[in-house]
Structures are given as C-alpha cells and as structure tokens.
Amino acid sequence: MCLYPKLILNRKYLPNKKNGGIPPKCPDERLRYVTAACGKCYECRKQKARGWLVRMEEELRHNPNAIFITLTLEDKWYKDIEKKYNIKGDNNVATQAMRLWLERVRKITKKSIKHWCITELGGNDTERIHIHGILWGVGLESLIRETWKYGFIFIGQYVTEKTINYITKYMYKKDEKHPTFTGKVLCSAGIGSQYTTRADAKNNKYNGENTKETYRCKNGAKINLPIYYRNKIYTEYSLNNVPLKP
C-alpha cells in the first residue's frame, strides 16, 4: 500500500475523448476527488515490480526465446549524446542511447526487438549508468554486438523466472550511495498481454461482488491481478464497480 497517497480529480468527471469533452455531472461532491498512489515510494515501486514480474513470466511462457543483457555507456559516448541532444541526467542519456540503438536495429531488421530494460548506476568508482534487460527473439547476440556501440556488452543465453525476479528488483532496490536515483523502465508495449486470452483469465471475468481479481502464480499462490490486466479485462463499468484492492 502506498506510503504517501494523494488526492486527485476523478477522471470520470473530467472532459476527455470518451465523453466528447462533456463529462457527466458529478452526483456527489465527495466523488469529485479520489485517492491515488504516489507511484514513487518504496511500496508503489514494489507493487509495480510485481506487476512486471507477472507480465514477463507470461511473455516467457508464450515466447521462451529470450536473453538477458547488460549494456554500458562509456564516458565518451555519454558526453557525446549529452551534448548532441542537449539532455542532462543519467536516465535521460540512457533513454536516448537505447532509442538510437533500437533505431539502428530497426534499420537492419525492419522491426524492433521486444524488450524490457531498466537503468542502474554502477557501484564502483565510475558510478556509470548502465542498462539491464531481457530481450525476446532468436539469433540476437550478433545483432546486439553489431549495433550497440556505446560500451561493454554482457549477454546471458538463458532467461528463467529467477532472472525475471532478479531484474525487476532493480525497480525498488535501495541504493545507499545514490538515494535519490530511481531506475527507469524502458520497454516494448504489450508485454505479457497473452494472459488475457488464456483460460485462467476467464476466472477474472466480471461477476459483480463475486468477481475474482486474483492471479494464480505457478507455485499456486494468489496475488492481486496486475493493473495492466485489470484494465484489459474489465470494461469501464466493471472498473467503476469493482473496488481496487491494495
């Protein structure tokens, strides 16, 4: 549960594309504001990490061809990107480097690589920004070595649930040396979307007060259904009538 929840205007009663810019009248002023998670505290980041863990495990279930990577940025390239694109900040530079790399990949393959990556600051003397990630696809190693020109490349040939658990922990890792730094997720859209077509997802079908908003893990444990799946499975009516559990 969020450590620092905040009040925001209820989007249901704000102008948007769905209501054609004419929102419905708010029947009760107490509904004008709703409580929302801050999205930045330790608990929020941990909850997001759990959601990503589930989604990547689902992706791996349907697409087991995946590799683990670590990519670094040498100082020369870091400064070059910083100056050329007039950007500041480790995460911004890493994001731009990733964008440029994927553009080179698309130029060669005519398509992008499905990926989930996160930034981290090094713990050694250089404290250099680097990127950990999981890529889905076949025969990627030579392509990566050909196109990533910014620094060191490490490639792990196997990805398991342990790998996913390891990499998602960077989302809420406590870094005493860099207490204000938060790793930035850089990823493809639709990771793990296959779950919504599985038989298990039918158990989440809206059923009033009896709606089951849980996801069953491989070990049998049940956790709250990740927000991504909740938004995919339920209609707007269902979302408004099924309370979001902490």
Language-model-derived ranges and their functions:
Residues M1-E127, G137-P246:
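Right-hand nucleic-acid polymerase module
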